[in-house]
Amino acid sequence: LPYIALILVCWSVLSQAAQTDVEERADKRRPIWIMGHMVNAIAQIDEFVNLGANSIETDVSFDDNANPEYTYHGIPCDCGRSCLKWENFNDFLKGLRSATTPGNAKYQAKLILVVFDLKTGSLYDNQANEAGKKLAKNLLKHYWNNGNNGGRAYIVLSIPDLNHYPLIKGFKDQLTQDGHPELMDKVGHDFSGNDAIGDVGNAYKKAGISGHVWQSDGITNCLLRGLDRVKQAIANRDSAKGFINKVYYWTVDKRATTRDALDAGVDGVMTNYPDVITDVLNESAYKNKFRVASYEDNPWETFKK
């Protein structure tokens, strides 16, 4: 009799797991990345994830020799935020690695993607390639742990200037040179300067990039910005000949703006208040159309309805 009971329990567990798997695969809702904005201190990682973020955006400043130096934004920044929090870049990477490595005491399973907002405006155009190489070296050592059970989050390199597209090649070349070209599978790209979509496409052609493309659009929360360019980016994403895989909008702090962005069809919302976005996603008008993205959602894959 105990054997029969055990068999029944095992069968029940297996059938439940199979049902969950089928339900997840059958879930036709658009996965959404809730992107915590300006997370520049290690302590803020937990703060934003605990508020509902499944991804974060971190500012990266460079020194005169194109070395990534600090996770720092500076003044001015978004209304209602402290602009001055910072860490040494490599220290932040170590903290981030702890937060995104399964088994670590600081592990946050929900944190699946990190956008590095690369402040390359301080660099000359001819330093972009070198900045990419140095960025790759730092990430390989301090985040990816030289390819040995490092952090698992997907990484988006967000570049503000189209002329700095050589940064992408420098980054890729350095990972290849150091014996870890496979880590490019975890890396995506974004040009954040609100340039014309066609010009962004041309920059990717020059960089030799196809795929893994996120397209941002937005402005500081202190100002208003319409959704015209977001809709252009979404049209590109959804067209057969488009080069964009995902679109995100920043900085979204209000429920009404969140609803407008979701109605337009964005994949990500960058915010100072992740709990606001979570609340909207739970509203009856949205919970059947959208869900918070998990690690199983490929951030480089265009969502098909």
From Swiss-Prot:
Residues of the active site: H37, H73
Signal peptide positions (record): 1-17
EC number in record: 4.6.1.-
Location relative to the cell: Secreted
Protein name, as recorded: Dermonecrotic toxin LiSicTox-alphaIA2aiii
Keywords, alphabetical: Cytolysis, Dermonecrotic toxin, Disulfide bond, Glycoprotein, Hemolysis, Lipid degradation, Lipid metabolism, Lyase, Magnesium, Metal-binding, Secreted, Signal, Toxin, Zymogen
Tissue-by-tissue expression: Expressed by the venom gland.
Binding residue positions for Mg(2+): E57, D59, D117
Any one Gene Ontology BP term: lipid catabolic process
Cofactor: binding comment: Binds 1 Mg(2+) ion per subunit.
Cysteines engaged in disulfide bonds, as pairs: C77-C83, C79-C222
Biological function: Dermonecrotic toxins cleave the phosphodiester linkage between the phosphate and headgroup of certain phospholipids (sphingolipid and lysolipid substrates), forming an alcohol (often choline) and a cyclic phosphate. This toxin acts on sphingomyelin (SM). It may also act on ceramide phosphoethanolamine (CPE), lysophosphatidylcholine (LPC) and lysophosphatidylethanolamine (LPE), but not on lysophosphatidylserine (LPS), and lysophosphatidylglycerol (LPG). It acts by transphosphatidylation, releasing exclusively cyclic phosphate products as second products.
One cellular-component annotation, GO: extracellular region
Catalytic activity reported: an N-(acyl)-sphingosylphosphocholine = an N-(acyl)-sphingosyl-1,3-cyclic phosphate + choline; an N-(acyl)-sphingosylphosphoethanolamine = an N-(acyl)-sphingosyl-1,3-cyclic phosphate + ethanolamine; a 1-acyl-sn-glycero-3-phosphocholine = a 1-acyl-sn-glycero-2,3-cyclic phosphate + choline; a 1-acyl-sn-glycero-3-phosphoethanolamine = a 1-acyl-sn-glycero-2,3-cyclic phosphate + ethanolamine
Species this chain originates from: Loxosceles intermedia (Brown spider)
Family statement drawn from the similarity comment of this UniProt entry: Belongs to the arthropod phospholipase D family. Class II subfamily.
